[in-house]
């Protein structure tokens, strides 16, 4: 079982997602079984942020002086539920999710679901630096999204 802590440092998030912890828990509820870590107590933190703060994190930790949609900070390089109970942190930028500005709440939530899946896979050790890894990660993202797209949002 995965326990999520959600911290919001940007009040704009509450305009699109009223109960953010419930929202993210509902996403995890529909993940494929292999990602549920049944019988384990696994934790992760989500920081709902904005472009200003995610840009600072991106500069500090990746040496890229620009905002981005999501950052993942895995607790371990490759997560092993037998050795650790903390996956890591996912930071998501409101402005990236809210493009275009007239995006509907449903479309906003769908984007958040997709980017959460992406960040979650990074916490598990997936990466997309090499083309073959990119293809593998995209395939896995699509598989998870198909599991949950009609059930969440």
From Swiss-Prot:
Its EC number is 3.1.-.-. Keywords: Cytoplasm, Endonuclease, Hydrolase, Metal-binding, Nuclease, Ribosome biogenesis, rRNA processing, Zinc. Zn(2+) binds at residues 118, 122, 128. The keyword Transcription does not apply. GO terms for cellular component: cytoplasm. Its main location: cytoplasm. It is found in: Cytoplasm. GO terms for biological process: rRNA processing. One of its GO terms (molecular function) is metalloendopeptidase activity. The keyword Nuclease applies. Its cofactor is Zn(2+). It is an enzyme of class 3 (hydrolase). It holds the Pfam family YbeY. Signal peptide: none annotated. It comes from the Bacteria. Binds 1 zinc ion. Belongs to the endoribonuclease YbeY family. NCBIfam families: rRNA maturation RNase YbeY. Single strand-specific metallo-endoribonuclease involved in late-stage 70S ribosome quality control and in maturation of the 3' terminus of the 16S rRNA. This is Endoribonuclease YbeY. It comes from Pelagibacter ubique (strain HTCC1062).
